[in-house]
């Protein structure tokens, strides 16, 4: 991973307010959390078939060096808008300005994550009803790549500017060796990094408990984590010193997955590199899951609803002083801005990189990506080629420096474009510095897989819950997770 000059980022920051109707390049980051928004779609049929034909748009002059896509209508399914209300407004403005500037029309399906990981998208793809371009977490694209609906990056790499691609080259080993290794190389292009496993904590709770934030935050290892959490709970003003996360959609990925990866490297993944075996029952996983469960069951540092606790609850409960420390995912950043206000601005609540348990890795990220799709079976090749070019022009917007410089505020993600990192603002809450340190130290990442959702969520989730509630031991949970994964994969 690339290095950088580690600068202290302690200055106060302005919480940017929503600017309704602002232009893309001037839009401020709206605050607030977003769930899966109700899907909405403009006129036109699915992009995979005959729908979304060209024509009907007023021709405009393209900027120098751009492809002329005026009059082209293409299908775009967009999921990233649910990161926050600010992200939704930002992206709607982005699309509107793209259409105005190019004369193309993006036939939008504004949707959320549920349809991607559930049955809706895959059923539509199988019925030849799919877009020309979509956004999603890279690890959720395996079913669509495996069905040969996604165009690999190498097939259109030459159509992206060299100077743009150069800022994303640092991610290519992660795609080639981990994410898309199953298909021989990178299939999609990342534009945003959703950070998993960072710490957030109340610095005033540390001080009231007699702890030193400069040396006790973040905790150095698992033993130190338990020690700090215990001190916060027994001597600080909060009710719970270290809140665990295990709610639906968050089961094991926020914790303890980043800890397993940091402890065991590739042994902390859920599959071997060649996908010939599941790893949930190895020593790394059993040790980490046991330590995770012990934080709640043995040390009592997490609240009574831990078995169902979601990380979206953290900002409000941390603002109220109920919990002192936890591991919220980075998209909670806009919610912290909205719900915490001055305590966030002045550094009372701060972020830090996640646990380093020996490998140097301090958490991981989900890359949010843009994917280009192949033509539908009934789509005219000439029409498809124009729609494909329009889709690539839209991808360029997501990868552009102007857009990348705004993602941290509007969506709580680290921009994937490397050259904008050093210009991220100094903040007292330290979010951007923490996320950057995590990205720079990332060594291994989960493989994309057609059955990723089952392997990462559906199989482990029930067993991690039973381990938290004490119905089964952590070791038994690991054994059952591995057994079910092997059965699913036919191993």
State where each predicted segment sits:
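Helix-loop-helix "hinge/cap" segment bordering the ligand-binding cleft or interdomain interface
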Residues: 96, 100-101, 157-160, 180-254, ...
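Short, solvent-exposed loop/beta-turn-alpha elements that line the ligand-binding surface or hinge
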Residues: 154-174, 215-218, 242, 263-287, ...
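Conserved N-terminal structural module of periplasmic/extracytoplasmic solute-binding proteins
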Residues: 7-9, 23, 30-149, 158, ...
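Extracytoplasmic/periplasmic substrate-recognition and gating elements
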Residues: 67-73, 96, 100-105, 209, ...
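Ligand-binding pocket segment of bilobal, Venus flytrap-like solute-binding proteins
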Residues: 142-143, 234, 281-344, 390-407
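Long, aromatic- and glycine/proline-rich binding clefts that accommodate carbohydrate-like moieties
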Residues: 73, 168-172, 178-180, 350-354, ...
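N-terminal secretory signal peptides and thylakoid transit peptides that target proteins
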Residues: 4-22
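Hinge/lid segment of periplasmic solute-binding proteins
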Residues: 63-66, 139-198, 255, 262, ...
């Amino acid at each position: 991973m690339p290095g950088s000059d580690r600068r202290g980022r302690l200055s106060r920051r302005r919480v940017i307010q929503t600017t309704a109707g602002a232009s893309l390049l001037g839009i401020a980051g709206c605050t607030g959390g977003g769930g899966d928004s109700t899907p909405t779609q403009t006129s036109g049929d699915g992009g995979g078939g005959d729908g979304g034909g060209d024509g009907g748009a007023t021709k405009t002059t393209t900027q120098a060096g751009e492809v002329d896509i005026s009059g082209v209508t293409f299908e775009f399914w967009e999921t990233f808008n649910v990161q926050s209300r600010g992200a939704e407004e930002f992206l709607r403005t982005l699309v509107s300005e793209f259409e105005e500037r190019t004369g193309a029309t993006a036939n939008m399906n504004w949707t959320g994550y549920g349809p991607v990981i559930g049955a809706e998208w895959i059923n539509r793809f199988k019925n030849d009803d799919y877009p020309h371009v979509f956004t999603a977490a890279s690890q959720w694209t395996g079913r669509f790549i495996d069905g040969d609906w996604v165009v690999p990056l190498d097939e259109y790499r030459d159509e992206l500017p060299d100077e743009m691609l150069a800022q994303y080259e640092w991610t290519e080993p992660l795609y080639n060796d981990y994410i898309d290794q199953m298909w021989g190389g990178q299939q999609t292009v990342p534009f945003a990094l959703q950070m998993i496993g960072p710490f957030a904590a109340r610095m005033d709770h540390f001080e009231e408990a007699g702890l030193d934030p400069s040396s006790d935050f973040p905790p150095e290892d698992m033993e130190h984590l338990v020690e700090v959490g215990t001190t916060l709970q027994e001597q600080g003003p909060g009710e719970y010193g270290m809140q665990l996360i295990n709610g639906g959609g968050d089961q094991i990925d926020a914790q303890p997955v980043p800890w397993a990866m940091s402890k065991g490297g590739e042994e902390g993944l859920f599959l071997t590199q060649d996908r010939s075996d599941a790893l949930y029952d190895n020593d790394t996983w059993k040790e980490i899951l046991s330590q995770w469960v012990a934080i709640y069951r043995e040390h009592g540092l997490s609240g009574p609803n831990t078995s169902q606790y979601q990380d979206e609850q953290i900002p409000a409960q941390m603002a109220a002083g109920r919990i002192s420390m936890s591991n919220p995912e980075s998209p909670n950043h806009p919610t912290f801005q909205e719900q915490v206000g001055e305590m966030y601005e002045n550094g009372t609540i701060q972020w830090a990189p996640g646990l380093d348990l020996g490998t140097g890795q301090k958490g991981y990220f989900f890359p949010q990506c843009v994917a280009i799709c192949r033509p539908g079976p009934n789509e005219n090749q000439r029409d498809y080629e124009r729609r494909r070019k329009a889709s690539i022009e839209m991808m360029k917007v997501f990868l552009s420096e102007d857009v990348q410089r705004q993602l941290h505020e509007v969506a709580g993600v680290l921009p994937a474009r490397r050259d904008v990192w050093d210009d991220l603002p100094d903040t007292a809450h330290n979010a951007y510095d923490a996320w950057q340190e995590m990205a720079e130290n990332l060594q291994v990442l989960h493989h994309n897989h057609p059955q990723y959702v089952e392997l990462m969520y559906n199989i482990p989730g029930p067993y991690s819950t039973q381990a938290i509630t004490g119905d089964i031991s952590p070791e038994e949970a690991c054994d059952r997770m591995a057994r079910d994964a092997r059965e699913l994969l036919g191993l």
